[in-house]
Amino acid sequence: MSQSTYSLEQLADFLKVEFQGNGATLLSGVEEIEEAKTAHITFLDNEKYAKHLKSSEAGAIIISRTQFQKYRDLNKNFLITSESPSLVFQKCLELFITPVDSGFPGIHPTAVIHPTAIIEDHVCIEPYAVVCQHAHVGSACHIGSGSVIGAYSTVGEHSYIHPRVVIRERVSIGKRVIIQPGAVIGSCGFGYVTSAFGQHKHLKHLGKVIIEDDVEIGANTTIDRGRFKHSVVREGSKIDNLVQIAHQVEVGQHSMIVAQAGIAGSTKIGNHVIIGGQAGITGHICIADHVIMMAQTGVTKSITSPGIYGGAPARPYQEIHRQVAKVRNLPRLEERIAALEKLVQKLEALSEQH
């Protein structure tokens, strides 16, 4: 499908979903549900936006099967999916939106590539990028302007390294990895020993950083190498901007770390963990699989059971909810205590009179 306009029926066939409505409706773009016009396809994933369904002018709306049962009587063109509507909408983006190319195909003459480096086929290396000795860049990789691939480091096939990324020496980047601008992978960890004279002496860090397949790393995120063991981000994990991952940390498979979170050294994060924005996790602990940490959670000890945690120190969400409810009741409790104190004073006065 290479054209830019599709009928509702064509899209349903391409997306492998059912549709309700006029199959001949022509669609030529994508838009949010509030802004969509008759030529646009949109989606409903979060029920908070269901209030826009009735007034939406969208030519077609992707919804889940459950949502369709609720809203089928609105007389709209619906594409009905058993998957997340957002995921199906993403496939539409790939149809309608043409990626912006950097305009620098192949290897730019200003790129600096060491004679011992191995560059596979179909690689794009933009202006002023540097590939150091014995580095290996896999096939169909893209290395952005001003990025550095350190000595003895590897970048797996179909990975996309955006401009001004620093991948230090002896770092392993897997296949289909995306690293956003300004990220630094493989810096020395923040490890020091204090001498008898109170001076802080930096410790050499000999470990590597290993980034497995299908990982995404946000802008200005830093992942430090371990002192002896490796720092590892397992397959499929997604890391937001401005995240700090310290030395010898292991992040499990398909986990998500939101902006400004920090993980101290030698901590092990399980699989399918979600770490909220500005959360802080101390070092040398373990986080179980399927843990969700709310924003600004402060984790001071290991979490051994799946669940939702928040607060500082971290505790189960239900406990926080109960505590918040009690805090809300404090003004009323204060009034009741004041009334009781007055009553006690009256009783004491009566007692003294008798």
UniProtKB/Swiss-Prot annotation:
Pathway: Bacterial outer membrane biogenesis; LPS lipid A biosynthesis. InterPro entries: Hexapep (IPR001451), LpxD (IPR007691), Trimer_LpxA-like_sf (IPR011004), UDP_GlcNAc_AcTrfase_non-rep (IPR020573). Catalyzes the N-acylation of UDP-3-O-myristoylglucosamine using 3-hydroxyarachidoyl-ACP as the acyl donor. Is involved in the biosynthesis of lipid A, a phosphorylated glycolipid that anchors the lipopolysaccharide to the outer membrane of the cell. It catalyses: a UDP-3-O-[(3R)-3-hydroxyacyl]-alpha-D-glucosamine + a (3R)-hydroxyacyl-[ACP] = a UDP-2-N,3-O-bis[(3R)-3-hydroxyacyl]-alpha-D-glucosamine + holo-[ACP] + H(+). CDD domains: LbH_LpxD (cd03352). One of its GO terms (cellular component) is membrane. The active site is at H247 (proton acceptor). Hexadecanoate binds at D240, Q244. GO terms for molecular function: N-acyltransferase activity. It holds the Pfam family Hexapep. It comes from Chlamydia trachomatis serovar D (strain ATCC VR-885 / DSM 19411 / UW-3/Cx). The gene is lpxD. Belongs to the transferase hexapeptide repeat family. LpxD subfamily. The record marks F43, Y49 as: Participates in a stacking interaction with the uracil ring of UDP-GlcNAc. Homotrimer. Keywords: Acyltransferase, Lipid A biosynthesis, Lipid biosynthesis, Lipid metabolism, Repeat, Transferase. This is UDP-3-O-acylglucosamine N-acyltransferase. It comes from the Bacteria. It is an enzyme of class 2 (transferase). Its EC number is 2.3.1.191. UDP-N-acetyl-alpha-D-glucosamine binds at F190, G191, Y192, Q248, S266, H284. One of its GO terms (biological process) is lipid A biosynthetic process. Signal peptide: none annotated.
